Amino acid sequence: MKQVFFFAIMLLTITSGCQQFTGSGNIITQDRKTDPFKGIAAGGAFEVEINSGSSNKVTVECDDNLMPYIKTKVVNGVLKISTSERAGFANAHMKVFVTAPEIDFIDASGAATIKANNQLKSDDKIKLESSGAATIKASVDAPQIFTEASGASTIELSGRTRQYTAKASGSADLKTTDLQSENTEVTASGASSAHVHSSVSLVATASGAANVNYRGAGALQKKTSGAANINPE
């Protein structure tokens, strides 16, 4: 019931005061010129696919009558994917194909879905953030991985790292058991759920009605409050 109320409020917020457009059904593609970027931020109802390549490239696929309202702009090294202000869409097809040599930051909000078709690699760190009803799915390989999921969003990861720092709140879900981490620090609150792995050490904190489930032989330090649980899978 709470999630239904949440999505109803979100829909009213998005559509209130907006000019509404219905997708024509005639799907076209358009290559966009772009400055170099290593991060991606997408909101709304976009589907974003990330592919590895030698240079940055952005291709938008959508209904022909919606193309003028799809915005792609690089700000401080982050590709911002959005729609025009005060424009709402119904029955819309909105996909963005992104190619980049390296991506080390992803921010998905609203009802956006961001999927990496190739493993994301960095010599330093990778940070992933999700909110609203957004979803991020990726395989990652970096010394440090940071995730933060809120609202009713989901982050699903595989790969490997030496240090994994994770936060989940609201009714968010972190599906990261397949991320082979040496040292993991996870904090879960609200009604969120976090699934993690550690081979060396695990520091877990859960509050409210949150759940933390873990795999691996890492030495465990845990703290719970309320109706929260921290258990092995």
Task: Spell out what each predicted region is.
Residues 4-12, 16-67, 78-99, 114-119, ...:
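Short acidic/polar N-terminal linker immediately downstream of export determinants
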Residues 38-50, 96-98, 103-233:
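Extended, compositionally simple hydrophobic/Ser/Thr-rich segments
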Residues 70-74:
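Solvent-exposed adhesion/ligand-recognition segments of exported proteins
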